[in-house]
């Protein structure tokens, strides 16, 4: 199975080439030329498998230049007990009769990004070998909070790799910033960027398409790749947990085979919910995909009107990982729903770059609305949902998961749709102690890492080990840069 760019499908790439390159040189995103279907009886077969076995089975359908043995080894290492604090890896928790929560934050950095970023280093280093690449890969990452730490943790001290992470200077939580600032490893770098996440992400994308930078780094023995969800190696491992969740529902007798289930996903860059769409296209019985946004509700408006318009105020919210106005992975959906019309997609992306907006056709809008439902949650609604979940279900959730639960509640009220629904829980509540304590009406709050102990006491839940040990770690990275200087930061890092 070959891969092509969303903006020019005339060139074909192997899976290893697509993963190693990360972003196509025309600025487009790689995706497979076709979507493999789940074989007959596959869901039933997978109910008896471990998470690692499911990952091997599903990923092998997309990665034909990797052996089953290789993928099996990668899955055992990526999702092993030394990395995840539960054998289930991504456990499904029942909230009430029709609602389940897919906990995706049991990995080493306590966010769903671990599900892909523990796997990506194995996929990337194996891809380099398959491509007979002798240069060192430098991974550039723009983060709205969680990706940065998960990528740093995944790639620290991995041979033939260096990783540089950029995050918005005042746009991540204190715990997220501390996680990155204390990162260990000899091959890692971290810098804040003055501006918001979109500034950091646009800066990184600009570096990828900078020919003179590519030549300069090649002479020094480096080439650039990405660990953001623009890399197919990030999207693919995420498909696994949607299929795995359905298999768990089958195993528990909560659904019968073929019964449709809705998924509600907190959404920023559109990568997580895109993986759910791929699972649906593979044949997973999914009814609706609920796209849950915060006050930066550019996607809610897009799904409703077909107009994508980032010309709007940018809000720093209590769910910072979704504070995004340019949702990169939407480009892959547009390519899929247009039947692979690369010129159309390239045109939309040029309009977005030049004017900040584009309008899809009525036909495309209807296709989007046949699967996706958009909704958003205000700051007050997000906080109220955290309190409500604690009061009614004794279940502590983070701010991003709260956005999804609120959107689900609104959707059910408006439509009466009582289809069983799985909410993707994307981060541990302990990553956002400040906002969660506010939601629980705690007025006299601690500061720094003492917030972790305070939330543990108030909630009766222990802080996850990777966060509880932060207070003992040394701060290594404190620098910041203007977005115009990101190129200099990278060249300096690679001296």
Predicted stretch roles:
Residues 1-495:
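PLP-dependent amino-acid enzyme catalytic core
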């Amino acid at each position: 199975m070959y891969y092509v760019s969303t903006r020019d499908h005339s060139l074909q790439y192997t899976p290893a080439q697509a993963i190693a390159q990360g972003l196509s040189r025309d600025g487009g995103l790689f995706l497979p030329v076709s979507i493999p279907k789940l074989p007959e009886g596959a869901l039933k077969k997978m109910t008896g498998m471990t998470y690692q076995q499911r990952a091997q089975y599903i990923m092998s359908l997309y990665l034909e230049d990797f052996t089953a043995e290789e993928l099996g080894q990668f899955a055992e290492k990526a999702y092993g007990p030394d990395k995840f604090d539960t054998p289930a890896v991504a456990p499904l928790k029942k909230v009430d009769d029709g609602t389940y929560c897919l906990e995706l934050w049991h990995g080493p950095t306590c966010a769903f990004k671990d599900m892909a970023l523990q796997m990506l280093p194995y996929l990337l280093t194996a891809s380099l070998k398959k491509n007979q690449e002798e240069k060192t890969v430098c991974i550039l990452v723009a983060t709205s909070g969680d990706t940065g730490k998960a990528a740093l943790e995944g790639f620290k001290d991995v041979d033939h790799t260096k990783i540089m992470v950029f995050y918005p200077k005042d746009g991540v939580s204190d715990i997220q910033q501390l996680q990155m600032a204390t990162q260990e490893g000899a091959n890692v770098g971290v810098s804040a960027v003055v501006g918001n996440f979109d500034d950091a992400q646009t800066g990184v994308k600009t570096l990828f398409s900078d020919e003179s930078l590519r030549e300069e780094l090649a002479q020094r023995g480096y080439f650039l790749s990405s660990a953001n969800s623009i890399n197919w190696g990030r999207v693919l491992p995420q498909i696994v947990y949607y299929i795995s969740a359905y298999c768990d529902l089958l195993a528990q007798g909560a659904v019968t085979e073929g019964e449709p289930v809705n998924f509600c996903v907190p959404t920023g860059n559109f990568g997580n919910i895109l993986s759910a769409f791929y699972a649906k296209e593979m044949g997973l019985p999914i009814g609706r995909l609920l796209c849950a946004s915060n006050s930066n509700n550019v996607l809610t408006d897009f799904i409703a009107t077909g107009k994508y318009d980032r010309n709007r105020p940018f809000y720093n919210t209590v769910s910072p990982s979704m504070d995004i106005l340019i949702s990169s992975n939407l480009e892959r959906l547009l390519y899929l729903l247009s039947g692979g019309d690369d010129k159309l997609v390239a045109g939309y992306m040029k309009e977005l770059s030049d004017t900040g907006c584009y309008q899809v056709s009525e036909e495309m809008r209807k296709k989007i609305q046949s699967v996706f439902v958009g909704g958003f949650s205000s700051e007050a609604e997000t906080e109220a949902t955290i309190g409500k979940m604690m009061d009614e279900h004794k279940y502590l959730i983070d701010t991003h998961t709260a956005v999804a639960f609120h959107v689900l509640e609104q959707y059910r009220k408006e439509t009466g749709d009582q289809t069983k629904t799985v909410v993707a829980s994307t981060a541990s509540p302990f990553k956002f102690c400040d906002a969660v304590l506010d939601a629980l009406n705690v007025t006299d709050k601690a500061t720094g890492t003492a917030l972790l102990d305070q939330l543990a006491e108030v909630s009766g839940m222990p802080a996850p080990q990777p966060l509880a040990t932060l207070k003992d770690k040394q701060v290594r990275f404190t620098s910041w840069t203007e977005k115009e200087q990101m190129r200099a930061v990278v060249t300096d890092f690679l001296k």
